[in-house]
Amino acid sequence: MNRLTGKYTLITGGSSGIGLATAREFIAEGATVAITGRNKDRLLAAKQELGADVLILQSDTSDVEEQKLLAAQLTKMWPRLDAVYINAADVTHLPVTDWNENTFDRVMNTNFKGPFFLIQALLPLLADPCSVILCGTVSTKIGLPQSSIYASSKAALCSLAKTLSGELLSRNIRFNCLVPGPTDTPAHMNLNTTDPDAVKHLQQEIKALVPLGRLGKPIELAKAAVFLASDESSFMLGTEILVDGGVGNI
């Protein structure tokens, strides 16, 4: 199918996991794709897999100045952006007693502050119409231990689906939140926790929460992202789509 033919699309955090799977699907649907990531080697590996036409841009989502530079680079190279997927994230999970200010700021800067200022910087490039997809987390729906700051940062991000949809209604820019449940990705495998036993225990605890009894697959999120990026979702804004195995509702 060619549901994204002619569309210029940006995926942050596109070198692995859900972002990479989404880039594959966007390309298969005819989109022109740019991906970002912090790690140059991973970006180059992703480009080798995705093809020479994919634009790779090294960028640290937590750095506001780098987000402004990213927007400036895209503005020079592309005529517009038809869809943006804010996917890059810091998934650090820690007990409430173990958080310090530096780790708190890193998670908030990556998951909320950086994305907000990227959106701001991209506004002149966003097409009419445009779809902006914000990657949330089902942890905002439940009381998952150790997810306090991660879930809070994602709740802040997804609140933009409503506030910015309302504010930018005249521009025909639609913001929606795509909410993954526990998904089999590299991020899920480490959770930015250094204690291997703690990681294993937390992974088991998370998997046990899923009514369907398994982790999600990145392609399952990617298919939902294609829908939100396409004209098929043109009557949707300010809302959430949960692809979570039932965690948030059952």
Question: Where do the PLM segments sit?
Answer:
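Conserved glycine-rich cofactor-binding loop
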Residues: Y8, S15-G17
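Substrate-binding pocket helix/loop in short-chain dehydrogenase/reductase
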Residues: P95-V96, N100-M108, I206
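Active-site loop immediately N-terminal to the catalytic Tyr-X3-Lys motif
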Residues: T97, P129, I142-S148, S170, ...
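Active-site helix of classical SDR
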Residues: I119, S153, A161
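Alpha-helical segment proximal to the catalytic Tyr-Lys
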Residues: P124, G166-S170, S234
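Residue(s) in the substrate-gating loop at a strand-loop-helix junction
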Residues: T137
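Short C-terminal tail/terminal secondary-structure segment
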Residues: V226, L237-I250
